[in-house]
Amino acid sequence: MKKTKVNPEDDITLGKFTPKPSPQDSYQGNFFDVFRDADYKDYILFSGGLILSAVNGALVPFNSLIFEGIANALMEGESQYQNGTINMPWFSSEIKMFCLRYFYLGVALFLCSYFANSCLYTLCERRLHCIRKKYLKSVLRQDAKWFDETTIGGLTQKMSSGIEKIKDGIGDKVGVLVGGVATFISGVSIGFYMCWQLTLVMMITVPLQLGSMYLSAKHLNRATKNEMSAYSNAGGMANEVIAGIRTVMAFNAQPFEINRYAHQLNEARRMGIRKAIILAICTAFPLMLMFTCMAVAFWYGATLAAAGAVSSGAVFAVFWAVLIGTRRLGEAAPHLGAITGARLAIHDIFKVIDHEPEIKCTSSEGKIPEKIQGKLTFDGIEFTYPTRPELKILKGVSFEVNPGETVALVGHSGCGKSTSIGLLMRFYNQCAGMIKLDGIPIQEYNIRWLRSTIGIVQQEPIIFVATVAENIRMGDVLITDQDIEEACKMANAHEFICKLSDRYDTVIGAGAVQLSGGQKQRVAIARAIVRKPQILLLDEATSALDTESERMVQTALDKASEGRTTLCIAHRLSTIRNASKILVFDQGLIAERGTHDELISKDDGIYASMVKAQEIERAKEDTTLDDEEDEKTHRSFHRDSVTSDEERELQQSLARDSTRLRQSMISTTTQVPEWEIENAREEMIEEGAMEASLFDIFKYASPEMRNIIISLVFTLIRGFTWPAFSIVYGQLFKILSAGGDDVSIKALLNSLWFILLAFTGGISTLISGSLLGKAGETMSGRLRMDVFRNIMQQDASYFDDSRHNVGSLTSRLATDAPNVQAAIDQRLAEVLTGIVSLFCGVGVAFYYGWNMAPIGLATALLLVVVQSSVAQYLKFRGQRDMDSAIEASRLVTESISNWKTVQALTKQEYMYDAFTAASKSPHRRAIVRGLWQSLSFALAGSFVMWNFAIAYMFGLWLISNNWSTPYTVFQVIEALNMASMSVMLAASYFPEYVRARISAGIMFTMIRQKSVIDNRGLTGDTPTIKGNINMRGVYFAYPNRRRQLVLDGFNMSANFGQTVALVGPSGCGKSTTIQLIERYYDALCGSVKIDDSDIRDLSVKHLRDNIALVGQEPTLFNLTIRENITYGLENITQDQVEKAATLANIHTFVMGLPDGYDTSVGASGGRLSGGQKQRVAIARAIVRDPKILLLDEATSALDTESEKIVQEALDKARLGRTCVVIAHRLSTIQNADKIIVCRNGKAIEEGTHQTLLARRGLYYRLVEKQSS
């Protein structure tokens, strides 16, 4: 035996474990933690990126120095031109010199911007690649206690959104912030250099500008958070309701839920309107402040120029230098939030990375014996879960398992059976006592070796997305193909694997070939067998299977257990009657122990009572039989599906996480609208919708048209602002060019125009933004409401469509409505302002110089073409970038979600290495993408300089040929410059308009969707219903599987007051029958009658008012207990509620709660146990006083103790009513007035329990299967 040190983290003195405090618990987060293990390349990239960003920022205000020179030359040229004495050689030389400087400055800005962003993007991707690997490695080595205190969704979210926040903080945002500070310092310095007096006046307004920007951001962030919180509440409520839509339909609660959703939306709408007004103020006030600042600065500057204290060009240059510096600093300041967010994300992620688990599952320390016998000893084991220290699970458990023995652990839920297995696997450490393997405490063994010598098969086996062979090889990577085949034969899996398309090379798991529960269980058994474990742990390995699958899996388990020490947990007592020893757990202690025969002989024993509770009374025999816990069948409305609703929801959740991770791994910016638009377009096509036009959207917004029209008028006024500014600005140029004694007076009068622009621009911005914001919010709320209302009115077939799953429908409400809102709210004002500014600016340019304007438009068009080409290339490679990250993102979500299986198989390093290999390609592609985006940013930043150079050179050519004047050239260039600024801002919203049209098309289609069945009950007869049910010759197939008949000539009748039970194998049509009675669907052929009325002639609302349904897994909503009991009803008194609760055996429990019937049950009833939820559901059914009661396996998901209480409540509830019962536990329906045996959609047997047993038909065989 190899011996090494005992794990230092465990103090095993006296069998008690004292974990050391984790130093990371006090970890506060450090921005520079991202540079842990960084090499010299990372530091070069970081320092280079910051230096170049600072240089780039500092160079931007140098534009003002060039502008001073060119403005002086133009004004002097204009003055000479007016006097007819222009010195063309001098003028031409000056203009060419400054144009050349513009060109050089553009080149410098391009190079600095490109290399700065390239350095920061590359650094960002290098560090994040390292952090992702560290994070996954750390997560996979944590212990169960740590996983209990966190959520899987939270862990994967940190890997996606958390990484995104770090990317924001250490990527281009840092460069923008550094550049903003550098621009401010440079701009102010240049201002003081050119004219300290004017700069001082300008500096007085700087605190006002920065302060207004800060306060705007602060209030806007607060308003946004409030709005998001309100919409989140509404979205959560909608998600819960749509998930429980069949319960909503069954209890006619659509009007209640529509009103509840409307109430939630009203609050969200109020917050949204408030945000819109704040946003309008935040946009209007800086505009007013800027124009006011211009008025003061230009008047004072003109006065200084007239006095000869400063050149005329410096008046313009100083203003723009200081303004550019201030604006850049203000625009950069919000990025401090990104850095703060990055620091918080670093804290969260590195807290995980640095966390040292109490149980180090990857430790190389501990004993590794060459051979073991397999004797297990539990000695005085005590245990409480760390998250529930007040509840002791094990209270001194002691037992032994000899080598080769099979010992079964039985008992009620929560008694400590699975906990014992978890302790043996060392997922947790016991609080007291000792667990020994061959006489040695398991803490002294190497934990990886310990787990590798144990094979475990659980109730819900985890199958990874890989081939069958690769899944089995997870048990032991060194096995041969022959070993795999032999293990599968032993596990009874070889036969079905050979029928798969690629046999052992068939890819299985989520998103690939789906296996049934029994098939997955047999693959898991084969995976356990190939480990050749000395110890085998079976944790309810057959409880989730139907009878046929269970028989095959049980046979495989019996083979696997031969010659191995086996611990078996079972609720189906028939599966463990041959065990060497049975240990009966009760309240954390072993209450009984012995063989099956020994324990069953104790009439008053716990084991004997459990068997009796499960046994089926049989004719001609009075033998006590062990009953199995019934199959937990697939509870969707299509029984032929392999995957359960819960699995599907989990797969969809993992798919969403995986998508976020893929985008996180390959995106270099936080927004990628091209992908969002493409995704939205694909969803639109799937929905069968067509892209809506803007006219369609405005037509829908007709109730808000008054506000829209008024706001559009003010938007037009706002659009005139910048073209008007260029004219007033040009007039100042003429005033300074002309000179004279009255310059100061003329400048003062000209400044009044700036004040007028401040007033008109600010007021029009405020009014247009507020009114359009209000209109957008109101329309968005109404759109959400209309879609939700129509969803509530659909029949069951609508929700069977895979396009209309819960996630898709809630996404429509949460995402598409805001997308459509973009076509109406403040973004419309921005777009229209840009368009108006463009046309007016171009109009001004052509008015003053028709021959000068085309060159400005041509250069702008050139930029658009270049930028569009880069954007198209990025879009082209976008999907390939996403595809490259599929495997890596899947490995992350799969390994974290299934951490316990990964650890049990000791495959942490395997999963880590697989992720490392899979993430190399997306890492390289992300860096390349960053270089292309750097090119785009660099072009945008340098274009203005090159545009000025080209425009002024062309203007010089026109002046030289007497086709234009210096003033005209200046006026046209400034008019086009102002227009281009506005249209560039508006252009950023164009992708949102494309998305708005797509989303509107989807939502309008959803609103127009007609239901086949009138769920509102506006039509149909409303006779008094007695409760007689008659089904004759009923044929039925689910709408999305028309070729597969579920009911094939089905016949059934139930007279008033009778209890009729439906039994039969899974998929025979039992639950379908109940759904037809509830009229979720209509039969294809045949008749379903209530009393003497065809169910299709009755009002659906009236029908359901007389029916109550209690299902296997009751749906409760996030309401109080009272509201859940009275769900869908009005005017129910407290006395009626309490009577119903008393009959349901829940009243005493409710009155023991602090808030009684006003206690909230939590989301999906999460604050109640399964039995408590079921009894609330029974009370909900009773309070309606229905004529017909439908019970669909109402006790099958409960443990024996809970089942007993609920069954008593059901027996009371069905008195005096027609009752249709579905049950797999045949013991629950043996006293029914009539039992109908179903198979293949037909009723093949009918009679009482005793009569059917006497026939020895299918019912008899079902009884035999459950008792064997």
Swiss-Prot record:
It is found in: Cell membrane. GO terms for biological process: defense response to Gram-negative bacterium; innate immune response; response to metal ion; stress response to cadmium ion; transmembrane transport. Residues 376-612, 1029-1265 form the ABC transporter domain. The keyword Ribosomal protein does not apply. Pfam families: ABC_membrane, ABC_tran. Residues 1-39, 122-170, 221-278, 337-708, 773-827, 870-931, 991-1268 are cytoplasmic. GO terms for cellular component: apical plasma membrane; membrane. Residues 1-21, 618-648 are annotated as: Disordered. ATP 1 binds at G411, H412, S413, G414, C415, G416, K417, S418. Residues 63-100, 193-199, 301-314, 730-751, 849, 953-968 are extracellular. PANTHER family: ATP-DEPENDENT PERMEASE MDL1, MITOCHONDRIAL, ATP-DEPENDENT TRANSLOCASE ABCB1-LIKE. Mediates ATP-dependent export of organic anions and xenobiotics from the cytoplasm. Hydrolyzes ATP with low efficiency. This is Multidrug resistance protein pgp-3. It comes from Caenorhabditis elegans. The lineage of its organism: Eukaryota, Metazoa, Ecdysozoa, Nematoda, Chromadorea.
